[in-house]
Amino acid sequence: MQVKIHELAANELNEAIEWYELQSKGLGRHFKKSVIEHIDKIKMNPDWFLIEADTIHKAYIPKFPYKILFTKESNKSITIWAIAHLHRKPWYWQNRIT
């Protein structure tokens, strides 16, 4: 399944990786690995994940206060709209979805 990542979601991911790496060497890599593993799980079965709103699904990242927000565009692709921190600005990402 093809994965499209919104530009701002990619920025969020990179900022979080950098922040975690500054907190503890290797922690940023661990966060990135966890996100990639969850994206792989989303690709295998996107319908398994809970609905956040309308057609937006959410996948929580274990051990980190983040969730991946995505839509299933077809049986062949998903779009990741946000890599959102759980304790900051809820619903800020909604204006990204057209």
Descriptions of predicted regions:
Residues 25, 40, 44-47, 88:
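Generic structural signal for secondary-structure transition and capping sites
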Residues 15, 33, 37-40, 44:
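Generic recognition of well-ordered alpha-helical segments
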Residues 67, 71-98:
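Enriched for short, Lys/Arg-rich terminal
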Residues 1-32:
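Arg/Lys-rich, positively charged N-terminal/basic patches that mediate binding to nucleic acids
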Residues 37, 44-78:
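Basic/aromatic recognition patch in beta-strand/loop cores that engages polyanionic ligands
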